Amino acid sequence: MEAGHGSMLLVYAVIAIALLILLITRYKVYPFLVLIIVSLLLGLVSGMPMATIVKSFETGNGNTLGHIAIVVGLGTMLGKMMAESGGAERIATTLIDKFGEKNIHWAMMVVAIIVGLPVFFEVGFVLLIPIAFNVARRTNKSLLLVGLPMVAGLSVVHGLIPPHPAAMLAVQQYHADIGKTIAYGLIVGIPTAIVAGPLFALMISRAIKLPKENALASQFLGAAGGEGKDGANPSAAKRELPSFGITLFTVLLPVILMLVGSWADLVFAPKTLPNDLLRFFGNSDVALLTAVLVSFWTFGARRGFTRDQIQKFCGECLAPIAGITLIVGAGGGFGRVLMDSGISKEIVNAATSVHMSPLLFGWLVAALIRLATGSATVAMTTACGIVAPIAAAGAVQVRPELLVLATGSGSLIFSHVNDGGFWLIKEYFGMTVGQTFKTWSLLETIISLMGLGLTFALAAVV
């Protein structure tokens, strides 16, 4: 449906994005509310019938949450079980022993990439930051040297590597092959994480000195005695940490199932029972559900947790993700209004007329929305709806898997004050706003630009 005409629709889109930035950054209005308000206003000024504006927004919101809410919920449960059982600590300590103290920043990057696969950035950060505090104290290293590689690994996984929920959303929107996307994501993501993580951390930790006293760190470092959650004794829990092998298997089980599912047609004839079974268990929802159920045994029952404790863990972990889930859904609603108002079509026409590469366009749109909303996931959600028609209609055809990477790279650019992650890192690291810009914001921009560059390089050879 087109409700407006001509180039004025492009002007409305620019004004809408500017209004998003103004309301979120200057007037501190919550992004969920801003996305709804701006979506409705955009529908009105673009000429959409009033009766269809709300329906359009609800359709986009529902289509987005219909998939992402399940992935987010299951991924968060898996991360919670791993944290409560000590699985994350097991992964960290094992890799630290293998890498050694001199290479601790490399170990933290690897830990973050592994742990971050099934969970959102904020969840992975909260799970791993206690480990970073303890590692920094034990090795007498700067928290920046230990922590920045960790957040770089989490960020790269967030935007570039399925089965992370944000990347999975882009895979779905572009109809990309998940197996190829994972492979390409690793090719682009690992070098990017190395540069933005350990190498950048080595440089910036020499230039920026954090205060010696950190109240949040003291809380985690001072929890050696007493009882843990649900009356569990910390020392007893530590003696019963899951093995490295079983922890790694449980965390990577969704990836394994999705990869095997993508090979179904190569192994079995289509529409046969074995083929259908592989595809069924390779579905992201089913793969994550399977991993969560397995974690109830590997991270739960085998660690001595009761059924009531496991159920409590699952309930506790869902409350913190409610806000980001609503924002993601609203981003999908905003993207649908852009489409139904005819703005997406005008953007397609404009981009086609200037012969912009679909990869560059996907990166640019996601980057603009990221700067406006502060959410990498919202940026990917909205940008995919805009860019997908260009990929289909443009003269230059590119692999949909590369579009996922380009859009994901754009969604990670320059985190600033409208991003919850910005404040999360500022407070936990004990930094000033200026220091957070020089570290976290710059790190995110390095990931974004290098991710785009490597995606273009990969496009030249695949």
Where are these regions (language model features)?
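Short helix-coil transition sites and intra-membrane helix breaks within transmembrane domains
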Residues: 27-31, 65-68, 79-89, 115-130, ...
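C-terminal transmembrane helix pair
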Residues: 99-102, 189, 358-462
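Juxtamembrane helix-boundary/capping and inter-helix hinge elements in multi-pass membrane proteins
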Residues: 46, 83-88, 98-102, 135-146, ...
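Hydrophobic transmembrane alpha-helices of multi-pass solute/ion transporters
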Residues: 2-77, 90-94, 98, 257-330, ...
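Long, contiguous bundles of hydrophobic transmembrane helices that form the permeation core
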Residues: 2-7, 183-312
